Amino acid sequence: MAEITKFEPGAQQTPRWFWLVFFALTVFVYFFGLTLPLLGPDEPRYAEVGREMFLRNDWITPTLGGFNWFEKPALLYWLEIVSYQIFGVNEFAARCGPALCGLGTIISVWLLCRKATSNSDFANWSALVAASTVGIIAFSRGASFDIVVTFPLTAAMAGFIIYRARDGSRSLPLVCFYFFIGVALLAKGLIGLLFPIGIIILYHVFVWRLPDKRFLLSLSWGFPIILVVAASWYLPMYLRHGETFIDEFIIQQHFQRFLSNKYQHPQPFIFFFWVLPLMTIPWLPFLLISLGQTIRGFVKRIRKVSETSDGSLKASVDGVVEIQTRSSPLVKICYAWVLIPLLFFSLSGSKLPGYILPAVVPAVILAAIQIYRLQGKSETIRRLVLTAAIATFVVVICSLIFVVPRFARHETVKGLIATANADGYNDLPVAGFIVASHNAEFYADGRLLRDSDGRQHRFGSVSELKEYVDLHSDRPLLILSPLELVHHLTNSELIRTDVLEDNGEVAIVLVRRR
């Protein structure tokens, strides 16, 4: 088939200059403010892992604080290593790779929609919708794995959809499909393979037929491509670490994370059923229109089949086929693409908002289909959509200038460590009091005290602190303490303390032997 979805004629063509300006604005927005302090527990840890690999010139073994860190594959760390080499070790470099992956996701959406519909204007509108989607913008700005796996998954699905749109006449789209599955395996592990294969299987269930012969034959040379790409990291990791790698990375970080709440991220089954829609803002209304039309069409055809069916099994099967083959193949692929990650992560024992990001892409494509059709009929809707996209960018920029820096001051220890360094304490060890500060992983610059298992050491009492400073009488210690607990340190007669600074949430305290 030459195209796998159709649009009503009469849609206005948007000037080319507008799309060029919007693309430039998108690039600006996605890189703006990447120098802000690293936030949350994950960004500093992943940035520190990349730095340690960079400083050792080691592209294989991820470490945190010098201890093996087998939580995730290496793609994000590789991006950080390259960025550190170019820009130095800083926040911008840590986030540069994810920002590029965000732009890569948008470009993949454009290519997918362009080749699937032979309609460049629709492709432009789809890219606009993807670029201005809150979920994609937010996760493209963080040094984390969610957008890093979303890009190759999107590129892989683009390869398959382009292959379908060209009636399987070329092998290059399938080469891209298999290549980017390999990249996705390097980005976040086994879901890089499970999701594309699962999506294609579900899509063929929707259309009620087997994959074409050319695609099935391609598996014989496609899986070797996947293996070669993935083996660039998995093979040397196994050769270097053996069964330890298999146990920690495959068994614990994949199967135990999915089957249990070992990593303490529990949420109800329906968690992603409301997180996913929120991530599609500001295009949620158009996604709901698409979903509503699909449900109404399905119910209408079910009723029609029920009225004409003679009750036989053959009639029932034919009815299912009729229901499934009347809607756009692109729409069906997108629904399969949404459902596989949605159901997979809903069944998982561990749930974090970013997990569902791969499903945001097909959701916004479904919204873009409705937007393109409606804006072609109504100048008001056209202006409304353009205004919403630009307004989203304006809100993001204003937030990064006026809101996020104030929030970041209370959420990062960057300023606290900088104050201690400026006071001449830049070589002192750092530890937490009662609680650990994961934000310090990056900013403490290798000075964190650690337990034998590699975790940050936390002093549980003032007496324990006294034992440490007595043992190391010639060297003070920097303590990061929640502000409400600082009085336990300052009021104690067991140690000498000096509160260097606080950020409203955490204080950094110099602790000496009394």
Residue locations for each model-derived region?
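Core SAM-dependent methyltransferase catalytic element
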Residues: 507-514
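N-terminal signal-anchor/signal peptide hydrophobic helix marking the start
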Residues: 17-18, 383-391
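Membrane-integral, polyisoprenol-dependent glycosyltransferases
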Residues: 2-377, 403, 441, 446
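Membrane-interfacial segments at transmembrane helix termini in multi-pass membrane proteins
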Residues: 371-385, 411
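Structural motif
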Residues: 344, 478-480, 510
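Noncatalytic linker/hinge segments flanking ATPase motor cores
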Residues: 63-65, 225, 264-275, 289-291, ...
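Short periplasmic/luminal acceptor-recognition loop of GT-C membrane glycosyltransferases, typified by
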Residues: 27, 393-504
